[in-house]
């Protein structure tokens, strides 16, 4: 186990039977609230983002991590929002959930991502839906997505296969 994996494991809270019976929820809140833990995760994510000139953080904890990584890299950060949170006009990408669908959005005015080299940052890679939708959203706007980086990957849910051929760096896998 790597040093960063040990930090994450020691500060991650496991909540049984949430949000439903049989699910073992992995809560990263204690990690993000710990100054040393947050710095360690920020440094590790930033180390995977070499060459990026923009960081895209996915709603909601990806905002926190993405902003921290962008500061470390000296780049800007783009908040990829859940649908309906931004004023029009927006660029949007809809993706499927287990029951229904969801939408991610970025502003269509005042922001040109064409030609930018972007790294996607999020807290968890589970089914891969949000990372894959973010990838499509950014590339449709002309950006080059270098890769994605997450704190935690839930391997049993197959997200890595869903986002292929996009490469993903995971700091901790379960």
Swiss-Prot record:
This protein's UniProt keywords: Cytoplasm, Glycosyltransferase, Purine salvage, Transferase
GO MF terms held by the record: adenine binding; adenine phosphoribosyltransferase activity; AMP binding
Domain of life: Bacteria
GO terms (BP aspect): adenine salvage; AMP salvage; purine ribonucleoside salvage
Catalysed transformations (reactions): AMP + diphosphate = 5-phospho-alpha-D-ribose 1-diphosphate + adenine
Subcellular location: Cytoplasm
EC number: 2.4.2.7
Catalytic EC class: transferase
Main subcellular location of this protein, as a coarse class: cytoplasm
Pathway recorded for this protein: Purine metabolism; AMP biosynthesis via salvage pathway; AMP from adenine: step 1/1
One Pfam family per UniProt: Pribosyltran
Any single Gene Ontology cellular-component annotation: cytoplasm
Quaternary context: Homodimer.
Its job: Catalyzes a salvage reaction resulting in the formation of AMP, that is energically less costly than de novo synthesis.
PANTHER family: ADENINE PHOSPHORIBOSYLTRANSFERASE (PTHR32315:SF3)
Sequence similarity: Belongs to the purine/pyrimidine phosphoribosyltransferase family.
Name used for this protein in its record: Adenine phosphoribosyltransferase
Organism this protein belongs to: Mycobacterium sp. (strain KMS)
Lineage: Bacteria, Bacillati, Actinomycetota, Actinomycetes, Mycobacteriales
